């Protein structure tokens, strides 16, 4: 039955895929990100049929998306086909589809597959691990001019905008327009914004330095805006100050306590001041995907489902929400929306379901173990905070690089990323500086 799910034909589009008496229980996992993959792997020995659904055929190592956006890495180097990741786990099937509805009463979901219409899929257990999307805080119209960075398409769009801006700067004789093309504004000074700004600064000062005759990319203006009072607000203030100083040395203008009021094709208005810019990038926050709201349960302001200490949806037996789709509290504080938390939640739920399938009752609620926070600020400099330990500098950067290489999904990803990093480190060059025809400058 699982194989049939992955090969739906148009004439089967209205069928209800139900579990028949005597068959194994079906666990449906929506989302092939960190939490979804972890949940599936935790069920590898379970006597269950596991169906992993994602609208994309690949898993993304999101912590390095900013390096695709700044041409350090190519998309394939931080991504892996979900089917390949699950190939050795015989109780897992993969379905390329987008979930468009959830019916808890009938315990079915609606899944729309490319070229195969919509079909209903029955479940015994449901794990929602659908991740997040950019949060424009009530101003979704900003998205047209300020793309976020949450998937490979976003990363390639941003890369094309950055590289295309320099091509357009070459073509104009207007001094003001050239300055606008060479001004980059990043909204949001969390880890994503800091890492993207630092990598972009290094790109314009080193990689592109001798590539143009009529312009000097090193004269570009890079502005990092945030409505809060400091960068990296989840880190200790001392580390935030160090990062701000390092960003300034790289040539990044850090403006905190500034709220963005308008984003349009000419730039942004922030703190009452117009900043002309052809490239505005949004790294200010995240919101949950639409799927948690389909459950009909309570959600927080970001659309994340409120769950109990066992990551279950209240009054919905066998339904769990994990990762960025869940609002998880611990000791009165929200569990951070980071990869390590998503992995721990997915693993916990997978193991919980496996025990329940054996007739065992799980008494221990989910507990998040904080392994520490890290952020890299370009070449040779990173910051680390773990409990009382707070470090920064070159050795911390080496630790960051080592941890991220080991965390990549496949051996080939680790080898390719390591190779690209070594090449970039010693030459200053970035080999993924491609502008696809679909993203040509001015289009």
What are these regions (language model features)?
Residues 178-235, 242, 253-255, 337-365, ...:
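Rossmann-like dinucleotide-binding core of oxidoreductases
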Residues 6-8, 89-109, 201-309, 313-315, ...:
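A Rossmann-like FAD-binding core segment of flavoenzymes
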Residues 2-15, 345, 350-443:
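C-terminal, flexible cofactor-proximal segment of oxidoreductases
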Residues 2-25, 92-187, 270, 281:
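FAD-binding core/adjacent interface of flavoenzyme oxidoreductases
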Residues 2-96, 100-101, 184, 191-235, ...:
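Beta1-alpha1 glycine-rich phosphate/pyrophosphate-binding loop at the start
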Residues 112, 129-130, 258, 283-284, ...:
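Short, well-ordered coil/turn residues at beta-beta hairpins
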Residues 131-134, 197, 286-288:
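Short glycine-rich anion-binding loops that position phosphate/pyrophosphate groups of nucleotides
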Residues 5-13, 144-174, 266-269, 273-344, ...:
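FAD-site-proximal beta/loop scaffold in flavoenzymes
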């Amino acid at each position: 039955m699982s194989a049939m799910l992955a090969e739906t034909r148009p004439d089967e589009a209205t069928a209800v895929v139900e579990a028949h008496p005597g068959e194994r229980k079906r666990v449906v996992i929506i989302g092939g990100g960190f939490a979804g993959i972890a949940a599936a792997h935790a069920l590898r020995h379970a006597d269950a049929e596991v169906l992993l659904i994602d609208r994309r055929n690949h898993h993304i190592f999101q912590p390095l998306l900013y390096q695709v956006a700044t041409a350090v890495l190519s998309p394939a180097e931080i991504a892996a086909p979900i089917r390949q990741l699950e190939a050795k786990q015989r109780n897992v099937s993969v379905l390329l589809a987008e979930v468009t509805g959830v019916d808890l009463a009938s315990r079915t979901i609606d899944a729309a597959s490319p070229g195969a219409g919509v079909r209903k899929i029955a479940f015994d257990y449901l794990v929602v691990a659908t991740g997040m999307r950019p949060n424009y805080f009530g101003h979704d119209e900003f998205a047209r001019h300020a793309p976020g960075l949450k998937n490979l398409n976003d990363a390639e769009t941003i890369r094309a905008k950055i590289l295309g801006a320099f091509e357009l700067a070459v073509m104009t004789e207007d001094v003001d327009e050239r300055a606008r093309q060479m001004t980059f504004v990043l909204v949001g000074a969390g880890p994503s914004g800091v890492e993207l700004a630092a990598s972009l600064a290094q790109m314009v000062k080193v990689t592109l330095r001798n590539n143009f005759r009529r312009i000097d990319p090193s004269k570009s203006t890079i502005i990092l805006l945030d409505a809060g009072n400091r960068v990296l607000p989840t880190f200790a203030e001392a580390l935030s100050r160090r990062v701000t100083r390092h960003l300034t040395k790289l040539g990044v203008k850090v403006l905190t306590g500034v709220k963005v009021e308008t984003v349009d094709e000419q730039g942004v208005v922030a703190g009452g001041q117009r900043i002309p810019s052809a490239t505005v990038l949004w790294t200010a926050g995240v919101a949950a995907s639409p799927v948690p709201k389909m459950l009909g349960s309570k959600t927080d302001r970001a659309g994340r489902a409120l769950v109990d200490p066992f990551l279950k949806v209240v009054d919905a037996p066998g339904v769990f929400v994990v990762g960025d789709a869940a609002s998880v509290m611990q000791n009165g504080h929200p569990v951070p929306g980071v990869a390590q938390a998503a992995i721990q939640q997915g693993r916990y739920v997978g193991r919980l379901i496996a025990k329940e399938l054996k007739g065992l009752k799980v008494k221990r609620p989910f507990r998040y173990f904080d392994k520490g926070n890290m952020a890299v600020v370009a070449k040779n400099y990173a910051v680390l905070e773990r409990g009382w330990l707070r470090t920064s500098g070159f050795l911390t950067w080496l630790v960051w690089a080592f941890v991220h290489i080991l965390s990549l999904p496949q051996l080939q990803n680790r080898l390719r990323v390591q190779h690209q990093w070594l090449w970039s480190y010693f030459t200053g060059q970035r080999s993924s500086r491609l502008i696809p025809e679909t993203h040509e400058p001015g289009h």
